[in-house]
């Protein structure tokens, strides 16, 4: 919904999507990585996700496998994604971190509004159809009423499954800025 809403206001916008339950300890490095990802997505039709360099085997996070042999010619710190991997068992997580091409999936995405809207048109057309049909009500008094009415008609699917795992122009920017998911009390105690 929000991508179409933003597109109605600024069709050239770039968007950063980030979970609200994470901590970032190195803000300058986070800013640098986000800035370079925004530059990349403003110049391409690509989607970028941030991949956190793992410091331990973790079974609570999904992983991103990057093809480190194919960095983007536009940015040597951004690589094509081979595959997304679901939350692994401990032995698999240990194997992942022994390699240098697996990163934690932090759920932080960067894309241009036109790229993500087009991706929904291709990979989740039923969802796209709902929000495309609302273009004339965004920013009006009818907007909330129509969202309340039509949103429940959308398939209940995460952006990971609907778009990220299917998209062809998908890249990862490996990052190390002191990220942690604070989704549990134990992770909060670590900080």
Residue ranges and their predicted role:
Residues 1-70, 118, 122-123:
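Conserved beta-loop-beta/alpha segment of the NTase-like Rossmann-fold superfamily
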């Amino acid at each position: 919904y929000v991508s179409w809403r933003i597109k109605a206001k600024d069709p050239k916008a770039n968007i950063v999507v980030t979970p609200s339950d994470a901590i970032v300890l190195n803000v300058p490095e986070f800013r640098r990585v986000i800035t370079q990802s925004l530059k990349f997505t403003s110049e391409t039709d690509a989607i970028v996700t941030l991949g956190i360099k793992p410091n331990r085997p973790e079974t609570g996070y999904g992983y991103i496998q990057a093809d480190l042999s194919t960095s983007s010619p536009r940015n040597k710190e951004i690589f094509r994604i081979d595959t997304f991997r679901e939350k692994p068992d401990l032995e698999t997580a240990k194997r992942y971190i022994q390699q240098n091409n697996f990163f934690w999936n932090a759920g932080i995405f960067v894309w241009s509004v036109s790229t993500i809207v087009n991706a929904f048109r291709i990979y989740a057309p039923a969802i796209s159809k709902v929000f495309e049909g609302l273009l004339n009500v965004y920013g009006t008094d009818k907007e909330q009423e129509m969202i309340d009415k039509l949103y429940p008609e959308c398939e209940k699917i995460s952006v990971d499954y609907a778009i990220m795992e299917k998209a062809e122009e998908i890249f990862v920017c490996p990052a190390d800025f002191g990220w942690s998911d604070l989704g549990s009390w134990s992770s909060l105690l670590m900080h």
